[in-house]
């Protein structure tokens, strides 16, 4: 297997871990209001049974979401990468409307024990889950209304971000070198 080959060549994935998520755009669906209602209620598999060709082109798993005023339709890829090599060690795909902090736990396993886990501010409330997996959470802090970050917190965030941003290189590579993060399949 690929991972065993890398181990034989001396690649060691013993550094910390970095987790983040990125949108994967899917083709927009042209459904009627009734069809959309059925999909949202979880009855998407019951639709178009009399038209198998049409059903094979319909995606009932993709969802709409909005981030910073921009709307996305599709999925979200959650990835865990090695801190040193930027190698994706594990990934999972959810619909786009799932919050980053809800889709990362399946990526954690026993091989991560004792390692640092770098996360952005969106995972702020996830420290107990990370600690339950015997990892050391390194999470950027987030300011809140009427409670902005102090200069000391900003300085700590900059230090954490120097490592955490490496996972952005992984998504950037996929987007630039691998024809983007576009889902070319129907359904998860």
Regions found by a protein language model. Give the residues of each.
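Polybasic low-complexity intrinsically disordered regions
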Residues: 1-133
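Helix-centered, glycine/charged polyanion-binding patches within enzymatic domains
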Residues: 116, 121-188
């Amino acid at each position: 297997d690929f991972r065993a080959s890398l181990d034989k060549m001396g690649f060691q994935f013993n550094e910390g871990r970095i987790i983040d998520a990125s949108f994967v755009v899917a083709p927009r669906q042209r459904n009627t209001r009734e069809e959309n209602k059925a999909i949202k209620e979880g009855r998407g598999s019951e639709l178009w049974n009399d038209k198998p060709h049409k059903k094979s082109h319909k995606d009932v798993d993709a969802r709409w979401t909005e981030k910073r005023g921009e709307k996305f339709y599709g999925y979200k890829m959650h990835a865990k990468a090695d801190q040193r090599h930027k190698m994706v060690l594990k990934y999972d795909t959810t619909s786009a409307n799932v919050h980053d902090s809800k889709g990362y736990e399946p990526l954690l396993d026993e091989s991560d024990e004792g390692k640092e886990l770098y996360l952005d501010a969106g995972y702020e409330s996830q420290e107990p889950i990370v600690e339950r997996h015997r990892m050391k959470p390194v999470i950027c802090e987030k300011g809140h209304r009427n409670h902005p970050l102090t200069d000391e917190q900003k300085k700590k965030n900059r230090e954490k971000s120097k490592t955490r941003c490496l996972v952005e290189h992984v998504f950037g590579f996929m987007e630039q070198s691998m024809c983007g993060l576009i889902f070319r399949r129907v359904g998860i």
